[in-house]
């Protein structure tokens, strides 16, 4: 499959967000701690923890910091107080939004998420209001320059659902949620270590945004991601390259 990267715009926006390194690390440490608490502190035996460690290393977190977070999860009851929640709603112009949070205070998190939607011209919806528009999938991304044919062969042999070659030469490998870990590890064993590997929510349909709407939607997404309890924000926004260039 070929085409322009529908998800590239989100990656560009995430690069801006990643500048807030301290906040990103806080979220990663929380995921490491909870993953270790729930599935044990040995990454080889805990797929969720293994993925969390990979993401932390990709973000340039030191191994010492990672090990301390894992040790905290195994040896502390703090992670037991954490619950994982999701919220659904609409950004301006009806763009669908899903927010995933990890919190020890449901009321605080709900109030903060609701405030962000309200302040940015969106609406917090009920459970199921937009979830039907998304499918949870694994996504493994490779920068331009990778051997396209060899990667495609390896991905399909490993059980990938789809391989998308983007206009800029980057490649995204998509998997079912259940097969994500096995496909990612099979690709790594074949010499294809993704620049980014994550479980994400892929929309079945997208909303193409103009500059004004994109600014409003990204303002909401940025505000949501600034919340300490929020781990991930997904949308069905598709921002064309020319609009993204104007956003800077």
UniProtKB/Swiss-Prot annotation:
Cited function: Involved in regulation of the quinolone signal (PQS) system and of pyocyanine production. Negatively regulates the quorum-sensing response regulator pqsR of the PQS system by binding to its promoter region.
Molecular functions (GO terms): DNA binding
Keyword Cytoplasm included in the entry's annotation: yes
GO cellular component, one term: cytosol
Gene Ontology biological process terms in this record: cellular response to iron ion; regulation of DNA-templated transcription
Assigned keywords, A-Z: Cytoplasm, DNA-binding, Transcription, Transcription regulation
Listed name of the protein: Transcriptional regulatory protein PmpR
Alphabetical list of InterPro entries matching this protein: Integrase-like_N, TACO1_YebC-like_2nd/3rd_dom, TACO1_YebC_N, Transcrip_reg_TACO1-like, Transcrip_reg_TACO1-like_dom3, YebC-like
Family annotation (HAMAP family): Transcrip_reg_TACO1
Entry keyword annotation includes DNA-binding: yes
Family: Belongs to the TACO1 family.
Entry's localization field: Cytoplasm
Protein species of origin: Pseudomonas aeruginosa (strain ATCC 15692 / DSM 22644 / CIP 104116 / JCM 14847 / LMG 12228 / 1C / PRS 101 / PAO1)
Pfam families xrefs: TACO1_YebC_N (PF20772), Transcrip_reg (PF01709)
Record lineage: Bacteria, Pseudomonadati, Pseudomonadota, Gammaproteobacteria, Pseudomonadales
């Amino acid at each position: 499959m070929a085409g322009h990267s529908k998800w590239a715009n989100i990656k560009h926006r995430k690069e801006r967000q990643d500048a807030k390194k301290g906040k990103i690390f806080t979220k990663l440490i929380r995921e490491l701690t909870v993953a270790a608490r729930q599935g044990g502190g040995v990454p080889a035996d805990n797929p969720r923890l293994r993925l969390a460690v990979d993401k932390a290393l990709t973000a340039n977190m030191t191994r010492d910091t990672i090990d301390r977070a894992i040790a905290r999860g195994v040896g502390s009851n703090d992670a037991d107080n954490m619950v994982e929640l999701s919220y659904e709603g609409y950004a301006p112009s009806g763009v669908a939004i899903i927010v995933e949070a990890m919190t020890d205070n449901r009321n605080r998190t709900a109030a903060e998420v609701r405030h962000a939607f309200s302040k940015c011209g969106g609406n917090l919806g009920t459970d199921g209001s937009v979830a039907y528009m998304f499918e949870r999938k694994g996504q493994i991304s490779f920068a331009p320059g990778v051997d396209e044919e060899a990667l495609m062969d390896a991905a399909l042999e490993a059980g990938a659902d789809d391989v998308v070659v983007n206009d800029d030469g980057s490649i995204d490998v998509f998997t079912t949620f259940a097969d994500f870990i096995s496909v990612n590890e099979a690709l790594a064993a074949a010499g294809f270590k993704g620049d980014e590997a994550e479980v994400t929510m892929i929309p079945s349909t997208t909303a193409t945004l103009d500059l004004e709407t994109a600014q409003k939607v990204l303002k909401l997404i940025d505000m949501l991601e600034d919340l300490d309890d929020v781990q991930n924000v997904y949308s069905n926004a598709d921002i064309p390259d020319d609009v993204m260039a104007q956003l800077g």
